[in-house]
């Protein structure tokens, strides 16, 4: 009979795992691998120190016993030295037993340590030849995944949302047992996107709840990839491990959860900023005048004396200011005002004589009120 209990001692992590695009995969697995390697190195260092200490203690015991035998054979009068060596030998044997007990505890600890991708197996062969099916084109696989996700969400969206609202471990396990088809990549992807949507809508408390369930599904998927089994066949093992209050495993879960929530907040912030930029650009395009210029930008580029004229909406004041300017500059600024819609030719200008050209200070131009955004820049 196969002993499946060893599966309870597997630390799920694999640097080759794939995660949803919204998750910073590189940082996630780099941190896990680094933390695991550091723990293994620290454990190995402690084990080597214990081994050295035990060997040194055994050496001292052997040396002390050798001296005792020499004194006993010599039958000299060194009774005091003999008693001292016997006391020392007794103390050293106590220390030896202490070192051996520590080594035994270390071996038990090593035996109970969770397996991981670095210790799960050893090379049986240095070279293997495996026939593999040719991979499908990346475009086809991506398109197929998108279609699969869309179909799955359309069918099970209500159930996925129900799972995302669960709080207790037992409730989550029972719901997945009753709806085992939800244990898949599509559920995890939907929950990630839902978290970002909730953060954009400023539903922070609800986002944190759904984020917790997202990490539950992510950890189950990682366990399945580590064991190379279907996620539906191993999700109960995740709940068994997490409910046994394994401190190290629980701390790892909490760390990944907090890191995920930070990434969700960052992604939501970027989405909001992008939407604001698109909105501002759309509003700017709405403001554009007949010549394609933004009245706000044109107003801000005008000399101060012309800006004052627009502020007080005084046509005569504007014409006086223009008449005092260099004709080239005046024509340049007035043309920009017309192109932006700050000024439009007077509708009565059609009464002017044919062929008569209106200049910057021509009274045939008058101010037409325009709706502004940040400033009322119309005269």
Swiss-Prot record:
One of its GO terms (biological process) is regulation of protein kinase activity. GO terms for molecular function: Hsp90 protein binding; kinase binding; protein kinase binding; scaffold protein binding. Constitutively sumoylated by UBE2I. Keywords: Acetylation, Chaperone, Cytoplasm, Phosphoprotein, Ubl conjugation. One of its GO terms (cellular component) is cytosol. Residues 124-146, 344-379 are annotated as: Disordered. It is found in: Cytoplasm. The modification N-acetylmethionine is found at residue 1. The modification Phosphothreonine is found at residue 119. The modification N6-acetyllysine is found at residue 155. SUPFAM superfamilies: Hsp90 co-chaperone CDC37. InterPro entries: Cdc37, Cdc37_C, Cdc37_Hsp90-bd, Cdc37_Hsp90-bd_sf, Cdc37_N_dom. The keyword Repressor does not apply. The modification Phosphoserine is found at residues 13, 121, 378. The modification N-acetylvaline is found at residue 2. PANTHER family: CDC37-RELATED, HSP90 CO-CHAPERONE CDC37. Belongs to the CDC37 family. Co-chaperone that binds to numerous kinases and promotes their interaction with the Hsp90 complex, resulting in stabilization and promotion of their activity. Inhibits HSP90AA1 ATPase activity. Probably forms a complex composed of chaperones HSP90 and HSP70, co-chaperones STIP1/HOP, CDC37, PPP5C, PTGES3/p23, TSC1 and client protein TSC2. Probably forms a complex composed of chaperones HSP90 and HSP70, co-chaperones CDC37, PPP5C, TSC1 and client protein TSC2, CDK4, AKT, RAF1 and NR3C1; this complex does not contain co-chaperones STIP1/HOP and PTGES3/p23. Forms a complex with Hsp90/HSP90AB1 and CDK6. Interacts with HSP90AA1. Interacts with AR, CDK4, CDK6 and EIF2AK1. Interacts with RB1. Interacts with KSR1. Interacts with FLCN, FNIP1 and FNIP2. This is Hsp90 co-chaperone Cdc37. It comes from Mus musculus. The lineage of its organism: Eukaryota, Metazoa, Chordata, Craniata, Vertebrata. The gene is Cdc37.
């Amino acid at each position: 009979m196969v002993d499946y209990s060893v599966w309870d001692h597997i630390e799920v992590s694999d640097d080759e795992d794939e995660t949803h695009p919204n998750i910073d995969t590189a940082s996630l697995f780099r941190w896990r691998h680094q933390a695991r390697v550091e723990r293994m190195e620290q454990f190995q260092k402690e084990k080597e120190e214990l081994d050295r200490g035990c060997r040194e203690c055994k050496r001292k015991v052997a040396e002390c016993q050798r001296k005792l035998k020499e004194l006993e054979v010599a039958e000299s009068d060194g009774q005091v030295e003999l008693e001292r060596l016997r006391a020392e030998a007794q103390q050293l044997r106590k220390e030896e037993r202490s070192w051996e007990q520590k080594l035994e505890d270390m071996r038990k600890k090593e035996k109970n340590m969770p397996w991981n991708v670095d210790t799960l197996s050893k090379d049986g062969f240095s070279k293997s030849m495996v026939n593999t099916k040719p991979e499908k084109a990346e475009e086809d696989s991506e398109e197929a995944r998108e279609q699969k996700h869309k179909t799955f969400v359309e069918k099970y969206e209500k159930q996925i949302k129900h799972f995302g609202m669960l709080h207790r471990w037992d409730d989550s396990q029972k719901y997945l047992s009753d709806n085992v088809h939800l244990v898949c990549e599509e559920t995890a992807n939907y929950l990630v996107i839902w978290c970002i949507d909730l953060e954009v809508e400023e539903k922070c408390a609800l986002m944190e709840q759904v984020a917790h369930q997202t990490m539950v599904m992510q950890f189950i998927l990682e366990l399945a990839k580590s064991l190379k089994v279907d996620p539906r066949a191993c999700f109960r093992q995740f709940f068994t491990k997490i409910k046994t209050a394994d401190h190290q495993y629980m701390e790892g879960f909490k760390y990944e959860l907090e890191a995920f929530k930070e990434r969700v907040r960052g992604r939501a912030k970027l989405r909001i900023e992008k939407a604001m930029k698109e909105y501002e650009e759309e509003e700017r395009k709405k403001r554009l005048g007949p010549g394609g210029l933004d009245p706000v930008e044109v107003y801000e580029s005008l000399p101060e004396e012309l800006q004052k004229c627009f502020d007080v909406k005084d046509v005569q004041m504007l014409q006086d200011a223009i008449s005092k300017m260099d004709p080239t500059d005046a024509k340049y600024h007035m043309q920009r005002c017309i192109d932006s819609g700050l000024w439009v030719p007077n509708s009565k200008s059609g009464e002017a004589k044919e062929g008569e050209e209106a200049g910057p200070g021509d009274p045939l131009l008058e101010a037409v009120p325009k709706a502004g955004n940040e400033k009322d820049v119309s005269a």
